[in-house]
């Protein structure tokens, strides 16, 4: 799990790719279909890290670069706009999702909660279901009145594999980020030691296609 936060002033470069297959049905009709419901994510991040954190990142890179291994890393973008908190007894988050295809292809993915007090929690996804307005299944003391659904999003109920260790209300949440299984997209790591205890590092990451 890579929890290092990027240099926010440098921005995040983000692109999507939707893989498709071309099928010949031998009747002169060619059709394309999506191989995966989820789009593939390509991301570039710039980090300003302490010596300890920089060494942890470089050690991870050399251990898993290329096809040697995979890791979880949040997108560090607001992919799920939370409309409930997460209760200790019911680890379910209701949110408007900007992730296309999340209802059909959520296996091996996780979500990361960034709280206003600085706490960060990552939990794997156990299930994603359409949210049914008025359903009692997701009501708890940590639900606060729903706003209108944001255009272009899907309102979903995300069941987590475990809770966050305590009740977390919506008001405590700064951001909820999609956290796909990822690998480094390049075998080259750019590291610039600007100080004996500060390194500027750029990495390129891509989400892993489910096969």
Regions found by a protein language model. Name each.
Residues 1-211:
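Extracellular/virion structural assembly segments
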């Amino acid at each position: 799990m890579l929890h290092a936060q990027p240099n926010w002033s440098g921005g995040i470069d983000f692109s999507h790719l939707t893989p498709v297959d071309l099928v010949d049905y031998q009747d002169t009709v060619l059709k394309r279909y999506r191989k995966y419901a989820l789009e593939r994510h390509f991301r570039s991040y710039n980090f300003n890290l302490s010596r300890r954190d920089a060494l942890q990142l470089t050690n991870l890179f050399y251990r898993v670069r290329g096809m040697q291994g995979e890791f979880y890393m949040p997108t560090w973008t607001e992919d799920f706009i939370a409309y409930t908190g997460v209760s200790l007894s019911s680890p379910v988050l209701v949110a408007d999702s900007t992730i296309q295809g999340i209802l059909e292809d959520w296996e091996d993915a996780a979500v990361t909660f960034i709280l206003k007090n600085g706490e960060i929690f990552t939990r794997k996804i156990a299930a994603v279901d359409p949210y049914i307005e008025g359903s009692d299944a997701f009501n708890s003391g940590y639900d606060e009145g729903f706003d209108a659904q944001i255009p272009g999003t899907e309102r979903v109920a995300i069941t987590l594999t475990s809770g966050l260790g305590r009740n977390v209300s919506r008001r405590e949440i700064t951001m909820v980020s999609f956290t796909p299984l990822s690998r480094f997209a390049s075998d080259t790591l750019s590291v610039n030691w600007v100080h004996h205890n500060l390194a500027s590092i750029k990495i390129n990451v891509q989400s892993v296609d489910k096969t």
